[in-house]
Swiss-Prot record:
This is DNA mismatch repair protein MutS. Gene3D superfamilies: 1.10.1420.10, 6.10.140.430, DNA repair protein MutS, domain I (3.40.1170.10), MutS, connector domain (3.30.420.110), P-loop containing nucleotide triphosphate hydrolases (3.40.50.300). InterPro entries: DNA_mismatch_repair_MutS (IPR005748), DNA_mismatch_repair_MutS-lik_N (IPR007695), DNA_mismatch_repair_MutS/MSH (IPR017261), DNA_mismatch_repair_MutS_C (IPR000432), DNA_mismatch_repair_MutS_clamp (IPR007861), DNA_mismatch_repair_MutS_core (IPR007696), DNA_mismatch_repair_MutS_N (IPR016151), DNA_mismatch_repair_MutS_sf (IPR036187). One of its GO terms (molecular function) is ATP-dependent DNA damage sensor activity. Keywords: ATP-binding, DNA damage, DNA repair, DNA-binding, Nucleotide-binding.
Length: 860
């Protein structure tokens, strides 16, 4: 929190403060929770606790500014021209900043210059190029919860992409948070599931009324210019709309301008995509590896896109594979059709740049001159792209080409209006091209003519006075002046009026120079004011085309993704998978897309066959043998297929998949007080509750975090449930060799193993998948390979022989229903035992005792 410290004895009515500080305190009171950048001349100043906080966050000096109400005022400041760099640092630390500008004219103001907050910069609403990661989406999100489930909305303000969903349960909501990874998350003040969002960046607590459903509908209809939300398919999504309404209100509050690029909202439904929970996304290392970096991830291998907007779209595809095979087949067809034109298309696409985010800044009217120059450059690539795509014989490609548009008129406008290499800011001047506007050219000619005159004046005066150190200069405080060195200043003519004394020079003014100074400043000021006006008019000319421009940017991003996938398919030897309605996955010579790129030796490709008759594979073999790689590659091949990409295999045939689950590896979740085994069991429970017969399930080493018999029992029961009840497509890796007996007891279960060769104290991993169970685990050989001391390995071998002599069949213990007592219900007591328990032997005669013996014998 960044609040003014009331311990500073600041009066609530502000009357004891100077007028300037009164103005500051009133503005700060409107934004108590965030930092306030208060414009004063060429600096943004921060005061009180804001100053202390900013000095720590930005590593800038903390000073004092006089006194107000009798106390020194802590102060820190940053130059206005460097504000973007400081904002970037603050946003990266999750801070929000209110930008307060001078909107009045200091020359005409009585008292403090009028100021107001013109925008609020927050982590989820930034659109400035300097503040954004160019190849990552930057999302603002809002979450709502009621008794029926969750509402979740996300907005990418830098593209206008507005989405909502209604996760039914906590696991699905957690998966959505993991997938979208918002930069800023809004939640209601009474949100009950704080454990779900704790630790996330950019948390913002919002009042309940902002989530009110009627307000949400009103806000959204107002934004989209509609009477209802039926056309967007979200009319009945009340929980999602509550979140979306809060989000839109927050954006309007912070941006303080219209948002014409936010034109629609889309409902994301579970049935449209392949669902992956948070653990699955983490374990598959799609865009982030287990260490939190981006190296050796699926995206790192697959993403060779040439535009930032293409890179962001590819990552969205990877995190949300779709189930619509018509769209997927179109993507496959496009990839195949583009393979011969990759080398021609990519250099041209590279010149398009990040048109998507430029358009967002255009919509917010914050686009800078260089944004418009980049937009012009993107338009200049369109004719070449159209020419290259025109000859491609593919209906999807031609549909994309049509969406790209031409924009010849806008290209011509920007070529006439903006110079080739404009400055960073319009206030620097020199943005509008010569010839675009006659009056501007006239004012510039006056300014340039006056400047030429001043150059001639300097030469004339130097010759007239004979003073070789004489020169004409200018600064913002004293205007134009004639400067003479201290050594020659005594020779200055009598009509020179001293204006400023420096250490080594004197500065003078003459009437003629003052006259031309007025001309120069007037003409420059008029030119700059007109230039700003013309620049604003460019927005008015461009914005009516915003919808078509956004469609073009989306088409260009999609083209970049598909051209990239075509290049990756050719370069990495990927093939086109076939979709089928039959359940199962059949892979011939499948490879792990990431591991094969980092290996120094050739990757050993492996087959996989899952079908209704072979729904579960029990995978055995040594550690480091490749079990986890084999399992993950199956999931990654499936994932690539369901985004429309080619895949690393000789041939793939894939049936319907609704979810991908992974229970692979685990670590203690110390923050939540959960052990490795607890994490493992929680993830396992999620799979057993939510998997279906169309789910792809990867289970690696279930039950290893507890005692042998507990672990074996759990692994057996989980495998049995997945194979018999759920009937999911399952890869089940285990070190419990007892589980290799499952195929004999259940239909649809098969054994496969990864083999190794042991020679003396060395071991060679074959990494080749074979049918049948592994013959041994090679645990001691792997331990030796890891560098465990030889005496420990020797002792382990002795102990192994002892254990095997006690239980020769220990490696193949028969596990059946009678040995599952740990999880089974208590056995029923036999009739013989019940009879004996009810018998009183002291009351029996010898004859009765004999009769009981015969009766008990008959009961056994």
């Amino acid at each position: 929190m960044s609040k003014i410290n009331m311990n500073e004895d600041i009066d609530k009515d502000f009357s004891s403060h100077t007028p300037m500080m009164q103005q500051y305190l009133k503005l700060k009171a409107q934004h108590p929770e965030i930092l306030l950048f208060y414009r004063m001349g060429d600096f943004y100043e921060l005061f009180y606790d804001d100053a202390k906080r900013a000095s720590q966050l930005l590593d800038i000096s903390l000073t004092k500014r006089g006194a107000s109400a009798g106390e020194p005022i802590p102060m820190a400041g940053i130059p206005h021209h460097a504000v973007e760099n400081y904002l970037a640092k603050l946003v990266n630390q999750g801070e929000s900043v209110a930008i307060c500008e001078q909107i009045g004219d200091p020359a005409t103001s009585k008292g403090p210059v009028e100021r107001k907050v013109v925008r609020i910069v927050t982590p989820g609403t930034i659109s400035d190029e300097a503040l954004l990661q160019e190849r990552q989406d930057n999302l603002l999100a809002a979450i709502w919860q009621d008794g029926k489930g969750y509402g979740y909305a996300t907005l990418d303000i830098s593209s206008g992409r507005f989405r909502l969903s209604e996760p039914a349960d906590r696991e699905t909501m957690a998966a959505e948070l993991q997938r979208t990874n918002p930069a800023e998350l809004l939640y209601a003040e009474d949100f009950a599931e704080m454990a779900l969002i704790e630790g996330r960046r950019g948390l913002r607590r919002r009042p309940l009324w902002e989530f009110e459903i009627d307000t949400a509908r009103q806000q959204l209809n107002l934004q989209f210019g509609t009477r209802d939300l039926v056309g967007f398919g979200v009319e009945n999504a009340s929980r999602g709309l509550c979140a979306a309404g809060c989000l839109l209100q927050y954006v309007k509050d912070t941006q303080r301008t219209s948002l014409p690029h936010i034109r629609s909202i889309t409902m994301e439904r579970q049935q449209d995509s392949i669902i992956m929970d948070a653990a699955t996304r983490r374990n598959l290392e799609i865009t982030q590896n287990l260490a939190g970096g981006i190296e050796n991830t699926l995206a790192a291998v697959l993403d060779c896109t040439v535009t930032p907007m293409g890179s962001r779209m590819l990552k969205r595809w990877l995190h949300m594979p779709i189930r619509n095979t018509d769209i997927l087949r179109e993507r496959q067809q496009t990839i195949g059709a583009l393979q011969d034109t990759v080398s021609e298309l990519q250099p041209v696409l590279r010149q398009v740049g990040d048109l998507e985010r430029i358009l967002a800044r255009l919509a917010l009217r914050t686009a800078r001159p260089r944004d418009l120059a980049r937009m012009r450059h993107a338009f200049q690539q369109l004719p070449e792209l159209h020419a290259q795509l025109e000859t491609v014989d593919s209906a999807p490609v031609q549909a994309l080409r049509k969406k790209m548009g031409d924009f010849a008129e806008l290209r011509d406008l920007l070529e006439r209006a903006i110079i080739d290499a404009p400055p960073v800011l319009v206030r620097d001047g020199g943005v509008i091209a010569p010839g675009y506007h006659q009056e501007l050219d006239e004012w510039r000619a006056l300014a340039d003519g006056a400047t030429d005159y001043l150059d001639r004046l300097e030469i004339r005066e130097r010759e007239r006075t004979g003073l070789d150190t004489l020169k004409v200069g200018y600064n913002a405080v004293h205007g134009y002046y004639i400067q003479i060195s201290r050594g020659q200043s005594h020779l200055a003519p009598i009509n020179y009026v001293r204006r400023q004394t420096l250490k080594n020079a004197e500065r003078y003014i003459i009437p003629e120079l003052k006259e031309y100074e007025d001309k120069v400043l007037t003409s420059k000021g008029k030119a700059l004011a007109l230039e700003k006006q013309l620049y604003d008019e460019l927005f008015d000319l461009l914005l009516p085309h915003l919808a078509d421009l956004q469609q073009s940017a989306s088409a260009l991003a999609e083209l970049d993704v598909l051209v990239n996938l075509a290049e990756r398919a050719y370069t990495l030897n990927y093939t086109c998978p076939t979709f089928t309605d039959k359940p199962g996955i059949r892979i011939i010579e499948g490879r792990h897309p990431v591991v094969e790129q980092v290996l120094n030796e050739p990757f050993i490709a492996n087959p996989l066959n899952l079908s209704p008759q072979r729904r579960m594979l029990i995978i055995t073999g040594p550690n480091m043998g490749g079990k986890s790689t084999y399992m993950r590659q199956t999931a990654l091949i499936a994932l690539l297929a369901w985004i429309g990409s080619y895949v690393p295999a000789q041939n793939v045939e894939i049936g319907p998949i609704d979810r991908i689950f992974t229970r692979v590896g685990a670590a203690d979740d110390l923050a939540s007080g959960r052990s490795t085994f607890m994490v493992e069991m929680t993830e396992t429970a999620n799979i057993l509750h939510n998997a279906t017969e169309n789910s792809l399930v990867l289970m690696d080493e279930i039950g290893r975090g507890t005692s042998t018999y507990d672990g074996l029992s759990l692994a057996w029961a989980c495998a049995e449930n997945l194979a018999n009840k759920i009937k999911a497509l399952t890869l089940f890796a285990t070190h419990y060799f007892e589980l290799t007996q499952l195929p004999e007891k259940m239909e649809g279960v098969a054994n496969v193993h990864l083999d190794a060769l042991e020679h003396g104290d060395t071991i060679a991993f074959m990494h080749s998948v074979q049918d049948g169970a592994a013959s041994k685990s090679y645990g001691l050989a792997v331990a030796a390979l890891a560098g465990v001391p030889k005496e420990v390995i020797k002792r382990a071998r002795q102990k192994l022989r002892e254990l095997e002599s006690i239980s020769p069949n220990a490696a193949a213990t028969q596990v059946d229903g009678t040995q599952m007592s740990l999880l089974a219900a208590p056995e029923e007591t036999s009739p013989a035992v019940e009879a004996l328990e009810n018998l009183d032997p002291d009351s029996l005669t010898p004859r009765q005792a004999l009769e009981w013996i015969y009766r008990l014998k008959s009961l056994v």
